[in-house]
Regions:
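Acidic-glycine-rich active-site phosphate/pyrophosphate-binding loop
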Residues: 48, 55-57, 135-140, 228-242
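RNase H-like, Mg2+-dependent phosphodiesterase core
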Residues: 74, 79-84, 210, 217-253
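Conserved core of the sugar-phosphate nucleotidyltransferase
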Residues: 102-193
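SAM-dependent methyltransferases
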Residues: 1, 5, 139, 185, ...
């Protein structure tokens, strides 16, 4: 399940985050292209905001079930789970935020591998910065420190037993916190695995530019040449342009 039904309010753009493009691909397509490399994934569900129906259609996605999102993340997730739980032969589900397109295939494979032995698998990374809690917002100098030893950030994709996470969403909507794992941890044991710093969430345009820079660093540019014999009675094309000449290439360039 790829969640892409938010309003992207903090991103501040006429085009929502899911449809922003890097190297010619939207964030939706980047996420899907990575996930489709794994044969274990039998169905793909994209949860979208109904106001973006035209944008979704323009992507011309293949083999992807489109589900309209709800008024919040929990309702959007439940809408997708409600569809998936009625599909035959599916017992596990991965739930992923479209705003985290930079997960590696190594992390994805690790999540799938751990799901063989656990009912919930979630990537996490340690908090390394100093943490402070403000006691009085009007007097920010009064703060208390928080020990970092037991603090960490969770990431997506997050994997679950399908029936269990569906039941929890359906029966605990009023208790919903921030992500799916916070709901699951109240009742079940969770396997945490090492996440990736590069799997950051795109919240604002600065995050997006950071991601764009990462993709630029992966690109390679080179210069090459080709040789063709020139013969009479043929047109000369270079880079697709017809060049006036008495000779033309015995080939295409």
């Amino acid at each position: 399940i790829i969640l892409a039904a938010g309003n992207s309010q903090r991103f501040r753009s006429n085009i929502g985050k899911p449809y922003q493009k890097i190297a010619g691909k939207s964030l939706i397509e980047i996420n899907l292209n990575k996930a489709t490399k794994f044969r274990q994934i039998k169905k793909f569900i994209l949860v979208y905001n109904k106001k973006d129906a035209k944008r979704v259609k323009s992507l011309k996605l293949k083999n992807v079930k489109l589900v309209v999102g709800g008024k919040n993340r929990q309702q959007s997730t439940l809408n997708a789970l409600s569809y998936l739980v009625n599909q035959k032969g599916i017992s596990k589900v991965l739930i992923h935020d479209v705003a985290r397109p930079n997960f590696s295939t190594k992390l994805f494979a690790s999540i799938l591998s751990n799901m063989r032995n656990y009912r919930a698998v979630v990537p996490k990374i340690k908090v390394q910065d100093a943490i402070k809690q403000v006691i009085d917002s009007s007097k920010e100098e009064y703060v208390i420190g928080k020990k970092r030893d037991n603090l960490f950030f969770t990431q997506t994709p997050q994997a679950f037993n399908l029936k269990e996470i569906y039941y929890l969403h359906k029966t605990n909507s009023g208790k919903y916190k921030d992500d799916d794992i916070s709901l699951y941890m109240d009742l079940n044991k969770v396997k945490f695995i090492e996440g990736e710093k590069s799997n950051f969430k795109i919240t604002d345009k600065l995050d997006f530019e950071n991601l764009r820079d990462i993709y630029k660093s992966k690109q390679s540019v080179g210069i090459g040449f080709d040789v063709h014999r020139l013969v009479p009675k043929r047109k000369l094309y270079l880079a697709g342009l017809n060049i006036k000449s008495k000779l033309g290439t015995l080939g295409h360039s």
